[in-house]
Amino acid sequence: MTTESALADGVREALSVDAEAFAERAAEEAEIVKQELRDGSFDNHQSIVGFEYEFYAVGDGRWSEESRAGEYALMRVPRRMLELMGFEKELGLHNAEMSTSPQPLSDHGLRAQLAEVRARLEAAENTAGVEGMRLVSDGLWTIPPAGETAREYLTDSAEVDGVTVAVNMSDSVRYHAMANADPDGTDRDGPDDARSADARVELSAPGVSLAAETVMPESLITSIQPHYQVAHAETLPRHFRYALRIAGPLLALGVNSPFFPPELYDDDWDGERVLDEGATENRIHVFESVLNARTDADKVRFPREFHDVETAVDRIAADETLIPMPDPGGSDRFDDAFGTFRTKHGSYWRWVRPVFEGASRSSANARIEFRPIPGQPTVRDSIAFQAAFAGLMQALAQREHPVIGLDWETARDNFYAAVADGLDAELAWVGRDGQRTTDTDALYDDLLDHAEAGLRTAGCADDEAAEWIAPLRWRVANRTTPASWKRDRVRDRLDDGDDFETAVVDTQREYIRQQAETLVDGGFSAWTGGD
């Protein structure tokens, strides 16, 4: 049996799962999770941090024909190479993902996270370099594979035994199954069943619209995801409410996807209009529009808060099921007792989300996954966001910071203002004195002071805490983000007479060249002559 036929069989199996029975099983297992919460199974003796880090591969022009054909053009990563790297597959064939080992929140724990990312990434780069490619940490790629257009790469699909398969997507049954289910969750009748217009995926962002048969356009984007395991599961709702209030301000510091591949822009959007009206963080638009096109409710969204932990469990169980995946079975994990519920985590696409799982009872945890931040220019900057998020989760709740009183609607508006304008956005905040402010310096002084304070309570010395947060303070002081760095260089190139496509592509190449020198051991501030 070919790989494609096996994938088609997997898709058909997924589409044959009874959606109602799946939902009933998830609801039943939610009761198991709630009982385990009452029994203290998800409690730990301290806070723990983890990290997910996504990359895409590009050609460096040294060896392979594909990489020589286009400097820093997107490249597909051979599956065997991913195994050699010790990385995991992601949506696109060009993607690679790393997940760190959970560590206690402390200076030693953060340094262990940093060391693990650096060691594994350096080894992966050495492996990739042999094949003439390198991994890029970024928010959204803009140079398609050599000899292909971005549109072709993102929309190419084929029929295999009556199943629609995205040619450049990894062999993830769930994602391929989305292309073969009608919007009401039912499967297609067969290879001759005509697809209706509303069954298509539509990527929609300022100046960009792209129709596709599959969710492959989501593979434009890459992210970092800090995780924070609470020590006591009953405190998760309070931590979650704080996480929603800091989502906008932290995203504003991290924006890094201001441009699409130039060919994807609508005809009436030239470079000037993109700079005037385009978003600084298009990754949010991509993920929301592509995946929300397949559901009745918007599964990808800024989430509502909850005030007790059982409500969080109920919301996950009741979330609209896109593809009711079959029970894989065959393992001996603690959370196999609620395997269907755990499956629903995978498509509980909220920008901040609660997760309940554990391979064993001793490792079971209740955590918050913080998903808004795009890939960053360097490892050091990426871990700065992990440290800031963890420090804020520690300090804001411990000190009962009054920003928890900021209404949810304003927290949501802050988030989408950051998507649009990054550090130039007007964000509302409630300071430690209880006064509401929109002053950027006052907001970030308070925010980052509390991030440092949280790290100190976790055992970091004063200078250690300051060191972890320093890359973010630099961004505030200099009003510079990765997105503004890219926008400034595109602006300069347009002013020098370049056309928009050349300006974007050459800026992307400059980004990757700078990153090649600083990704593992340097910092973003050095790109502009900072310390």
How should these model regions be labeled?
Residues 128-137, 248-278, 395-418:
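Flexible helix-coil linker/hinge segments at domain or subdomain boundaries
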Residues 2-214, 220, 363-366, 383-395, ...:
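Terminal catalytic/cofactor-binding subdomain
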Residues 101-109, 223-229, 368-377, 431-436:
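Glycine- and acidic
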Residues 59, 102, 139, 182, ...:
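Short, flexible loop/turn elements at secondary-structure junctions
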Residues 457-531:
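C-terminal amphipathic alpha-helical interaction region
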Residues 64-67, 107, 236-238, 296, ...:
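Short helix/loop capping segments that flank catalytic or ligand/cofactor-binding pockets
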Residues 371-464:
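Substrate-recognition/cap regions that form aromatic- and gly/pro-loop-enriched pockets
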Residues 142-365:
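Loop-rich catalytic cores of soluble enzymes, especially ATP-dependent carboxylate-amine ligases
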